[in-house]
Amino acid sequence: MIICKTREQIAKMRDAGKIVAEVLALMEEYAKPGISTAELDQIAEAHIRKSGAVPTFLGYGGFPASICASINEEVIHGIPRSDKILQAGDIISIDVGATFRGYVGDAARTFPVGEISEEDARLIRVTEESFF
């Protein structure tokens, strides 16, 4: 069953999505060699909370983090850890959710870490093109 939303509800949904987009932009900026996925999680959570939102994933079904972070061949929804350090040549997939005024924004992106192989760059490019 589809529930039609009011203009006000749609605006709130957009606001939640905007926060997620801002977090993903930060993740792209900070996803550099030497940073841990736990540090990325802390950056994401700080921005979500500063924006007046709540990290949607944190505590959901016992999930211990604000983002899901998966490096290279790891399946999405990886748990950020302080011992998972990004290396040049990695690709990282990050999933972010933010609940704002009762509405959830949720999106995932994959980013290169430093210089990556042509094959990995093509994978990211083709995947992005299929969505946009």
For the regions a protein language model found, what residue spans apply to each?
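Active-site neighborhoods and metal-handling regions in enzymes and metal-associated proteins
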Residues: 1-132
